[in-house]
Amino acid sequence: MLNPIVRKFQYGQHTVTLETGMMARQATAAVMVSMDDTAVFVTVVGAKKAKPGQDFFPLTINYQERTYAAGRIPGGFFRREGRPSEGETLIARLIDRPLRPLFPEGFVNEVQVIATVVSVNPQVNPDIVAMIGASAALSLSGIPFNGPIGAARVGYINDQYVLNPTQDELKSSKLDLVVAGTESAVLMVESEAELLSEDQMLGAVVFGHEQQQVVIQNINDLVKEAGKPRWDWQPEAANEALNARVKALAESRLSDAYRITDKQERYSQIDAIKADVIAALQAEQAEGDALDENELGDILHAIEKNVVRSRVLAGEPRIDGREKDMIRGLDVRTGVLPRTHGSALFTRGETQALVTATLGTERDAQNIDELMGERTDRFLFHYNFPPYSVGETGMVGSPKRREIGHGRLAKRGVLAVMPAADRFPYTVRVVSEITESNGSSSMASVCGASLALMDAGVPIKAAVAGIAMGLVKEGENFVVLSDILGDEDHLGDMDFKVAGSREGITALQMDIKIEGITKEIMQVALNQAKGARLHILGVMEQAINAPRGDISQFAPRIHTIKISPDKIKDVIGKGGSVIRALTEETGTTIEIEDDGTVKIAATDGEKAKHAIRRIEEITAEIEVGRIYNGKVTRIVDFGAFVAIGGGKEGLVHISQIADKRVEKVTDYLQMGQEVPVKVLEVDRQGRVRLSIKEATEQTQEAAAPAAPEAE
């Protein structure tokens, strides 16, 4: 019989329910988590044994949204869900990041977490619900896992922190921050902000971590009631003899190698050392004994980590010779590509980004159909990380999870300074091509995007820059590193990325690999990051200190006019015939909004003027008594239809063609013939009565010479 176990608790303004034991009983663990009608079903399956030769931890997080959750049927030919959307990929990464550090070192059994959104309240985002569910399912499973974690979203509305704000509340919030952590430590932060201070951001992190303790407590209580026995797993005992031998062979040489400042040269030397160590050990092996290269790789990595970390903690120069708070050399160039609307090449040490900005019309905006509803995105940010950027070969194709995640982070860094649509009615696409990478290419993308946008003439509110910080901590001793290299990222305890302007922070991302990161350490890191950010902004401002006064000659110029909403149908025409003909005739792009706003986009100013003139003709009111030049469009037995200004058509009755009786209309008029017509009447239905006879008489009278005056 089914025996569900349920826990309910209040979490901010929402009620959260955790339920297990009802579904998916063949999975290692399963839990249904709901928060005010948004429900996510999360399962965990773990392999009891690791695959032979497995040298990494194969954790897979799948997050999937089902359209039935919102009472909808999927679009597309097959009418079913397909590959993960960008949003699903980003939430999968959000779940993964705080969970991965909590699995013990040496645990390489395959683990898969699947989170399926099965019901959605449009006001409650499923991401926090899915994170809570993944934490609960792993805690229930008995798999070696040092959790649970809690997760919270924090908003900042009217100078107050708000726990798990609704979607409507987020629209007026200056902050959208997600924080996850254990009972004692923050592990992950992801956020975007509207130029908030370091203290405000840190306060939000602390607030979110404090509030999520209720989640951790309730998961612990659920585990006591329904948890499976903890797996009897122990890490393999270290091979002390091999450790000592490898250390003797490699430590001093690796220490010297990590003084080589050039990345490629350093890597070549490290590869040579590893090859020499393998050769030496193989020569010492007894015949028939095989060398475990995975184990050897782990030992060498531990030695490298110790070499770099001990040097930093001792106050010695870093791998490339810098002090802890030094930024690598900067090279900033704008306008590097002649035909793009805006471009920049941003180089920081061995990290380089070629960034472009392209302006388009509203038609170029991305329509996104999400579970939470449809929305239109006018600012697109795409990040590409080709294999040549790190001197490797590899597959080139659709973006991978990492590229999607880095692109979103860089976009968050710039979003707060983008102009409003009513001030700058363009769709903007930024593309960052990473041409070299050795640490923090996403933050180089933020800097490059700011430069390219200003080069394109986009009136951003302020220049923004980004910086990646690192941390090395042993006991109470810690050092915060500015502008970390790739090696410092891998061998350190924290990856901490901050983007912002001189005024405040626009994006903060934090991934912490250890416990014990205190508020004071985060404060030091944020303040040090501010100094680095201001330094980079100073160098950027020497290249370009304000948006260009005009957009590129190759960019479409958008001209806006207003027409009466009643006239929209006239400009569009039957089945779009009029607007289609207008765009072809003028070579422009024309978009009409429901309030009568008309936007004409053209790269040629004369074409735009022509389009505006034609629209004004079409929407002009017809004046009774006025004479127009018209063109015969149809001939019928009882008269002829004549098109006058603005594509409007009126009827010339057979009695109004000439000043004598007309038996046959075609005796007087031909298709396409241009004739003067006078407007006799416009009835309530908008039908127009015209007269050629009166127009001709009036024209002749005006042209006749005046009679001589009597003497």
Curated annotation (Swiss-Prot):
SMART domains: KH (SM00322), S1 (SM00316). GO terms for biological process: mRNA catabolic process; RNA processing. It catalyses: RNA(n+1) + phosphate = RNA(n) + a ribonucleoside 5'-diphosphate. It is found in: Cytoplasm. Keywords: Cytoplasm, Magnesium, Metal-binding, Nucleotidyltransferase, RNA-binding, Transferase. Residues 556-615 form the KH domain. PROSITE patterns: KH_TYPE_1, S1. One of its GO terms (molecular function) is RNA binding. GO terms for cellular component: cytosol. Its cofactor is Mg(2+). Involved in mRNA degradation. Catalyzes the phosphorolysis of single-stranded polyribonucleotides processively in the 3'- to 5'-direction. This is Polyribonucleotide nucleotidyltransferase.
